[in-house]
Amino acid sequence: CIKKNKYLIIDETYRDFIYPDKGAPHNLFSIPNWSKNLIQLYSFSKSCCIPGHRLGAITTDKGLISQISKIMDNIQICAPRPAQHSVAKFLPHLENFVNEKSNEIETKANLFSKSLSASSKWEITSIGSFFAYVKHSYNNIKCDDIAKLLAKNCGLITIPGIYFGKKQENFLRMSIAGLSLKEIANVKSRLEKLEKYI
């Protein structure tokens, strides 16, 4: 981006849920004059549990922020001023809450990974703060049909991989953040129950 004089836009809505022991996901802010080619997007809705108010942050060059502000003043999803002022005062007091949530989500992700690690039919190809992308081994069955069978017979709601693009037929996206530890521990047995219906 520096060579081509372009902006790299990174959406770090989930940055507070990156596993603490993994360290920073990148070192882009250590590059001299990073703000000339980097735009970081962030949302308070996930970390601080403040959904619906469209509150977030943009970190970049001051001149560019000035231009972005002009656009935001003229669109409907612009964050309302009272909510902006309220959140600004509370942010310093939310650090412990955010850390607790981060640890809770890490525990859930680790349990989910451990639960599926022994499965021969299912493989976690990527896992993040809220979702896991899981590969199934039923090559002769469409993933949307797999998703229907899981919902109807196993009590698992998933999103077929084809919703995310081509060549995703063998994948399902599963949400794990909203589950209890007990529910996560039961996912493997529910997936295995699918064998009865295939």
State where each predicted segment sits.
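Active-site pre-lysine segment of PLP-dependent enzymes
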Residues: 1-8, 14-50
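Conserved core segment of the aminotransferase class I/II
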Residues: 34-106, 110-114, 195
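Conserved glycine-rich beta-strand-loop-beta hairpin in the small C-terminal domain of fold type I
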Residues: 88, 104-113, 123-136, 146, ...
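PLP-dependent enzyme catalytic core of the Aspartate aminotransferase-like
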Residues: 149-158, 164-198
